[in-house]
Structures are given as structure tokens and as C-alpha cells.
Amino acid sequence: MPETFSASATRRRLRWPAAVAIGGALMMASGCADFAGEAAPNSWQPAPALSPEQPPNPVLPGQAGPSSSGDQGGRQGQNGTIPPPQGCQDFNPAVIATCLDAVSAVVALPGTDTDPIGLAAERTSGRIVRVHKGDPSQLQTTLQVDTSTADGGLTGLALSPTYTQDQLMFAYVTTATDNRVMLIAPGDTPKPILTGIPRGTTGNRGVLAVDHRGELLVATGDAGSPALATNPASLAGKVLRIDVDGQPAPDNPNPKSAIVASGLFEPGGVCSSTDGSQAWVTDRTPTEDVLYKLQLGRPLGVPAWTWPDQPGVAGCAAFSTSVMVATSTAGNVQSLALNKDGSFTGTPQISLQGPQGFGKLSGMDIIGDRGAMASTVNRDTGGTPVSSDDRVIIITSQPAGGGQD
């Protein structure tokens, strides 16, 4: 049976404060916790065919618009070629942190709209660091993690819905015996609030987000056993919805159960729109990558979008008119335009790939209604790191129709 730890935290059912809207274009830019310083794919399959709006075009700072071709440094800027990195110095204006271990997850801090500050989670080291352009990365805490599996470690990160008051954050980690959710409070030792999530040789990645009601969404891997994902007695391969104490959210369809959806394999990201209208989870199945719309009390059902070419879907950011997905195999950002009924049609707007991109991407978090923070994992297996990897970047969203001259 899973165990829970009671956290002493004041709860308020508030939406997260919007982090920021950065301009008009997606811009890339174990001890106690210390908070003192605070080629394009061509095989997509959509759900029902309607006529969508065009999604926003993700572009980098200094660019007039997106480009689908072009090196991992995002070298073409508005004013000419951007020099390649020199050691840990990266000249791309989208980059806000460099020379990290593979960054599995990022979160943007609330109240840093025009000058983003974030927290970055390193998968293999267990470190969580504060990142801000122009400042050295500041260690917040280090979690004990087991990295003997290919996909385990520190893989998920989320802030308390009342972070500006309590500075609490949550992390998803792999240990020698299980996967679990940790609560991290300023000046205190990280504590588990949900344990007993099955661990396997694969399928250990778990991801976190907070929904618009202030509850924690936890998407768990299947621990390498698809049967566990459909077993109602197991926490593997599920979407869980818990409160800050690790207990089932009281307004879950079954108030006594944390499970709100079943059938995941290797979730890459979970995200909720700031207006509370949509929540999504990405997943890598044996035959295709998928994006599911989360609806409490309903099965995952037919994916809202599928990628038979398996680009390695990872973190996501949900906007009112589109969903942006980072990929770690294809190494790009794919933006899907939402129809009014919540479905997608057309093909994804692909950007930040090849020479215009940053290589393998993993974590993503929304910043306001037009921006996102993302991370690279080029130092993970299969990556081709440059000297400044791994990095945290900022993306801003330009309305469709804008392009490079």
C-alpha cells in the first residue's frame, strides 16, 4: 500500500499566479533546502477533422519569426549569426542557464514575468538549482536518487499552488525500492508524501504539474509492466491527483482514490492551462507517441493526437488556443492548434530543430499566456552536447503568420 507523509502547509484553493507574458513572440531563453536568493516529421494523425486556428509560432529572442531548418546553438539571430558557445558562455539570448547536468524538469517562478527565474531539476545528480539569466546557478537542494535504471532519477518538479507564501515545491524521484513524490520546504529536509509507486528496469519517469484547483497532478510510468498500468490496485501507469499532503484530492471522482486515469507507459509531461479549461499528458507507447486530454472521471480513451514517428514527446505547455510539446528524440518543439471543441487538426507547427534548435529537449513549463521555459538533455544517452550544455531556455510565442523576412 502506498504511504503518505503529512506536510504542515497552509492550503488555499487558488490558481497558480501567472508567471509572465514575455513579449509577443515563445522565447527560449540531500541536505536542507536553501531558498535564500530567490528533418520535420511527416506522419501525424489527428483526432476529428475540423478547421483549426493556426498555432502560435515558437521563436527565439532576436528572431523575426520561426524557421524549421537551420545547430544546437540556435545560431541564426535577427542581427546575423550567433557565435557558438565558448565553454559555459552561450551567446544565444534565449539561454538563461548553462553547464548543468541533463535537466529533466523546469518550473518558472511566479512573479518573474518580464525577467524569468526558474528552478531546474537535474535527473542524475538529484540537484535542484535556481536559474536566472546573468546569474550563476544557485543550488536549492539535493535529493537522493537512484539512477541505475535508464530513465529513473529526479524527473518531475512542481511548485506549491501558494508558492509565493510557503515556497514549497514537489519532486518526483526514483529510489532503490520505489518511485515517490517528495515535499521540499525551505530550511527542512525533503520528505516523502507519496511512496510505493512501482519501480522497474524501465518506465520509471514520472512528471508533475498543479491544476487550476491547486491539486497536484502526478503522471507515473508503468515500471516496465503494461499490466500494472491497467491494474486498479497499482499506482504505476496512472495519472494521480493528490493534495499537498499526498492524500487523494477531496474532489476526485472517487474521493478515497488518488487515481484519476490509467493506462500510461512512459509519460513525458503533464500540463494544465492557466485558464483551467484544459489539462494534458504526453506519453510514449511502444508503437507511437501520444497526447491525451485529461478529464476527471473519464478514461484516457482515444488520444487527442498521435505521432507514429515517435519523436520522444516530453514536457508540454498548455495555452488557451494551443498546446506546445517538447521532444527529446526529434529535438524540436511541436505546437498544436486547438479547435473550439478541444480537438486538433492539421499538422503541428515544428520549430527549434536542427541548427535552429538546442538538441534534445525535456522539461517545459508555461510562463504567462504566451511563453514557456524549457530544458535540454543533451548529456543524456544519445545526445550530442555542446560546451554549454545542458541548458535552460526561454521561448516566446509569435502569432501565426509572422515569419522571417
Where are these regions (language model features)?
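Sequence/structural signature of beta-propeller domains
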Residues: 2-19, 23-25, 33-405
